[in-house]
């Protein structure tokens, strides 16, 4: 059974437009995704495709002007707002984008301890520090005294000290040098190998492929494909969706050919397939309605032409 099931998720915001008129705009639509215990599912896509919004919806930390549709299930039970609040930080934990998440005025040991709900918090904090090769004296340091790698390990400690079963890593590796990057990725893989379900949100497909079991490709507020990681290989012939193939071929080690056009703005989404205006395979049929996600060759795809 999946530890996380997202079914037909939509996220909309009520916003003020010109003339102080209120308008409801949908940023995520018809999104389906699952994460099993022991696996890393990497969520990749361009900025503005809805990756971080998905994380915030799962955690229940969207702003008050947000409206959420569809269902999110954790261990088979629907995540209501009250349940999200209860298990956030304990059973479901976030590894945030930036080390700026750490309070600059508080010693890091104290920052790691709050998620602990049973047993001695300091003992558990020291145990998780040992796991990530942080000495006891680190607990008395302030964030500015840490190296980049140490700060990342403190964030990992905060996310795992409570024994969380679902870890959401939101762009956890930006700006890292190669050594620190590999260390961070290995730590995330170890979480899955210990039985956690991990959702890794990233722009970096290459890094994701080193640890992910599956890759979910996002475009304009929904996922267009979920594929076994090993299908991202060669010329992308094993991939299903045209956008996934274009994304793969645009990498420097492949054809390094950019994708023509841009991802549409929320206010300018096409009525049919969201990728249709940029797709070389598009037909008139693609303009009529949004394709549904369907199973295909050990993966999932949202395209009527995929075979």
Question: Where do the language-model regions lie?
Answer:
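P-loop NTP-binding/switch modules centered on Walker-like glycine-rich loops
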Residues: 176, 180-254
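Short catalytic/signature loops enriched in Gly
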Residues: 228-307
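Conserved ABC transporter NBD signature motif
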Residues: 67-78
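ABC ATPase C-loop
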Residues: 154, 159-160
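ABC ATPase NBD coupling module
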Residues: 78-93, 232-239, 268-270
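A short, proline-enriched helix->beta-strand linker immediately N-terminal to the Walker B motif
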Residues: 161-165
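Q-loop/switch helix immediately C-terminal to the Walker
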Residues: 98, 104-118
């Amino acid at each position: 059974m999946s530890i996380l099931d997202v079914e037909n998720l939509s996220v909309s915001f009520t916003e003020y437009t010109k003339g102080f008129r209120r308008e409801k705009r949908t940023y995520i639509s018809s999104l389906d995704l699952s994460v099993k215990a022991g696996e890393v599912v990497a969520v990749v896509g361009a900025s503005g495709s809805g990756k971080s919004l998905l994380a915030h919806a799962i955690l229940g930390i969207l702003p008050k002007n947000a409206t959420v549709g569809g269902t999110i299930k954790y261990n088979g039970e629907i995540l209501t707002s009250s349940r999200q609040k209860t298990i956030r930080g304990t059973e479901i934990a976030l590894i945030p984008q930036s080390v700026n998440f750490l309070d600059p005025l508080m010693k890091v040991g104290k920052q790691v301890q709050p998620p602990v709900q049973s047993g001695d918090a300091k003992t558990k904090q020291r145990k998780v520090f040992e796991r990530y090769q942080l000495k006891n004296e680190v607990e008395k340091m302030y964030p500015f005294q840490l190296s980049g790698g140490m700060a990342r390990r403190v964030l990992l400690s905060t996310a795992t000290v409570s024994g969380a079963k679902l870890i959401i890593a939101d762009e956890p590796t930006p700006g890292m040098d190669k050594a620190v990057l590999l260390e961070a990725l290995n730590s995330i893989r170890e979480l899955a190998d210990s039985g956690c379900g991990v959702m890794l949100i990233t722009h970096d497909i290459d890094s994701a492929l080193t640890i992910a079991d599956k890759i979910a490709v996002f475009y304009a507020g929904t996922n267009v494909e979920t594929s076994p990681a090993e299908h991202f290989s060669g010329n992308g012939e094993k991939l299903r969706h045209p956008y996934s193939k274009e994304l793969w071929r645009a990498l420097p080690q492949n054809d390094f050919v950019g994708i023509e056009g841009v991802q549409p703005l929320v206010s300018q989404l096409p009525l049919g397939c969201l990728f249709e205006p940029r797709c070389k395979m598009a037909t008139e049929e693609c303009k009529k309605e949004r394709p549904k996600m369907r199973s295909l060759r050990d993966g999932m795809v949202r395209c009527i032409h995929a075979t």
